[in-house]
Amino acid sequence: MSFTLAIVGRPNVGKSTLFNRLVGKRLALVDDQPGVTRDLREGDARLIDLRFTVIDTAGLEEVTDDSLQGRMRRLTERAVEMADVCLFLIDGRVGVTPSDEVFADILRKKNAHVILGVNKAEGRAGDAGAIEAWSLGLGEPVRLSAEHGEGMDDLYHILRPIAEGFAERAAADAPVVDVDVSEEEADLEADPDAHKPTVKRPLQIAVIGRPNAGKSTLINKIIGEDRLLTGPEAGITRDAISVRSEWQGTPIRIFDTAGMRKKARISDKLEKLSVADGLRAVRFAEVVVVLLDVEIPFEQQDLRIADFAETEGRAVVVAVNKWDLEGEKQEKLAELKEMFDRLLPQLRGAPLVTVSAKTGRGLDRLHAAILKAHDIWNRRITTARLNSWLGAMVEAHPPPAPGGRRIKLRYMTQVKTRPPGFVVMCSHPDEMPDSYRRYLVNGLRDHFDMPGTPIRLTMRGQGDKNPFKERKFRTPSRLRKHLGKKG
């Protein structure tokens, strides 16, 4: 019973509150200030046994120019055309306004299924607005309180027959496919490519950066349509907007985030909410694209953003935007690489890609870099290979001997992926200097081809149980002396 429902209406009638109610999470920013929502935000909605896609839209306003409000209105009209059903919300406490009448007329012409909802209609305060709503000519209004969850049953009974109609149509149009889905799912764990993106498990990408770096423009170019609001004004995006799409054959879910300024500059309450929303999007993501402006790259805030993504353990790709504006490309590229290596040593080897979100140049390279970063982030190395490598590393450069006691490295294993995490069993783990840890981490990157991805390395003492104690490994002779084995 899958269909798409767009929630539309004037600013501040409760669209985002209802969106959050339907998706069961606080995904959209909510505030009593009009115009909080500026982009189209999609979510997986659930209403009793109905499952559908819901779109939260910017408020409809009576403007048609190229102002910010005008572009917001055009995005909303696009959502109306995309949706199977429109839920037109008015404010029950305010009643029907002249703008409501104009937009009701527009919706009648643009969409076959329009449901009229009177929000904030709890108690007697909403009675007059609910009665007045009949004058819009959209049929019987459904009384709702998005904030308190009232009227959801009534909305369900209106949506159910519409959903059944779409389900019957989809079943009639669906091709017959001779595939045992259960067998495919059962083989997923045995598949070495199990981490590859699929429609059910798309690659999660977050695009982050300072305000006006071109994040929304880049995403619009990637997905091939104007889904996100763009313009010269810094800070247009306020939410972390998520869009599902396919990019050069790769199923993706891509997050656009609010621009992240220095904390001292974040004074507006909405902007604080937006930045926190962007940080949450990083935690949802698998690959984070840090987008820089070629004219002012590697500002202090860029470095903080990249460091945050690495600290969160996400695969990182650095993209330098507005490359079409750069005249001396070779000299600038050499300068960017030098700055990257010097200012972000924790991301040594991470891909640096030049792009133009405006023209689309460089998106092929960006796509390839994201897929490679995701593959490395999911990489698993066998214990035998790790211990063979560890023996060679110790032989080339033995651990220090603090207080005259040599630190002995017993064995090593990988304990997790996403990002790769390793444990080394050793004597005196607390005395292992950071310089030797970096030596091992850099060696892992170089030997196993894992540039740029965060690597977690933990030292554990001999008191911890060795899960490989009873197992026999065929190890090189030079490693046996370090593992305490007898030939």
From Swiss-Prot:
> So what does this one do?
GTPase that plays an essential role in the late steps of ribosome biogenesis.
The disulfide bridges present are: none
Q: Which family does it belong to?
A: Belongs to the TRAFAC class TrmE-Era-EngA-EngB-Septin-like GTPase superfamily. EngA (Der) GTPase family.
Which intervals hold domain EngA-type G?
Answer: 3-167, 203-378
Which molecular function terms from Gene Ontology are attached? GTP binding
Q: Where is the KH-like domain?
A: 379-463
Which region ranges are annotated with the description Disordered?
A: 459-487
Name of the protein: GTPase Der
**Gene3D superfamilies of this UniProt entry?**
3.30.300.20, P-loop containing nucleotide triphosphate hydrolases (3.40.50.300)
Check the record and name the SUPFAM superfamilies matching this protein.
Answer: P-loop containing nucleoside triphosphate hydrolases (SSF52540)
Binding positions (GTP 2): 209-216, 256-260, 321-324
